[in-house]
């Protein structure tokens, strides 16, 4: 279901199961193995929800009982693009759902003094303009890195309506800023936090996702 006030923001159903998963990964005392395990579970849910929004066409197949089944098949090709480093944690979840999926990478780092993003590196599939793109980054805080990454994709010929931005936690500020720049991009998220602190980190948040996932 789309999350108001933006039609292209989709919040996962806030079930007890999902809230339980977030309780574990937000807990500062959670061990690294548990943080990885339960984060991966949420990532899988985000990927599955993202796949639900891809266009399909009707397809009829014959079953082993010699009967026809009317189903659907996906129209087009997809790829994942992770915003390095934290976004790489979401790549396996996409691979688990989509066999032989192609993965690109964009490295954007935040200036700790200005909190502004800076592009350092990009490696994308040559035919990315022909694909639907799952942009992967666990946290949407200020929106600066996500906006820059999306600009890179658009410059490579990807249409905004073919981009699906998947993240575990986002801020209202980040959504507003990102949506103002790219209203046609779909955002699929699992949690909406109340805001940012003086260091531009999500609150209540969970700390630095990349550090906790990769144990740095």
UniProtKB/Swiss-Prot annotation:
Question: What gene is this protein a product of?
Answer: FUR1
Organism in which the protein naturally occurs? Saccharomyces cerevisiae (strain ATCC 204508 / S288c)
- Residues annotated as binding uracil are 202, 207-209
Enzyme Commission number(s) from the entry: 2.4.2.9
**Catalytic function, reaction form:** UMP + diphosphate = 5-phospho-alpha-D-ribose 1-diphosphate + uracil
How the protein is activated or inhibited is described as: Allosterically activated by GTP.
Q: What is the main EC category here?
A: transferase
The note describing how and how many cofactors are bound reads: Binds 1 Mg(2+) ion per subunit. The magnesium is bound as Mg-PRPP.
Q: Which residues bind D-ribose 5-phosphate?
A: 201
Q: In which pathway does it act?
A: Pyrimidine metabolism; UMP biosynthesis via salvage pathway; UMP from uracil: step 1/1
Post-translational modification Phosphoserine, affected residues: 82
Record's protein name: Uracil phosphoribosyltransferase
């Amino acid at each position: 279901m789309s999350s108001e006030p933006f039609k292209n923001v989709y919040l996962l159903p806030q079930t007890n199961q999902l809230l339980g998963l977030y309780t574990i990964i937000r807990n500062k005392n959670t061990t690294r193995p548990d943080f990885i395990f339960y984060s991966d579970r949420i990532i899988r849910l985000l990927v599955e929800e993202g796949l639900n929004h891809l266009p399909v066409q009707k397809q009829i197949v014959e079953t082993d009982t010699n009967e026809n089944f009317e189903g659907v098949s996906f129209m087009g090709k997809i790829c994942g693009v992770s915003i390095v480093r934290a976004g790489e944690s979401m790549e396996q979840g996409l691979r688990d759902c989509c066999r032989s999926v192609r993965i690109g990478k964009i490295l954007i780092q935040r200036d700790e003094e200005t909190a502004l993003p800076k592009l350092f590196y990009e490696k994308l599939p040559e035919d990315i303009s022909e694909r639907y793109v799952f942009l992967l980054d666990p946290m949407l805080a200020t929106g600066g890195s996500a906006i820059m990454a999306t600009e890179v994709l658009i410059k490579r010929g990807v249409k905004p309506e073919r981009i699906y931005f998947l993240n575990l936690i986002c801020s209202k500020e980040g959504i507003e800023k990102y949506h103002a720049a790219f209203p046609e991009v779909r955002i699929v998220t699992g949690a909406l936090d109340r805001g940012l602190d003086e260091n531009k980190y999500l609150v209540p948040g969970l700390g630095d996702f990349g550090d906790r996932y990769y144990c740095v």
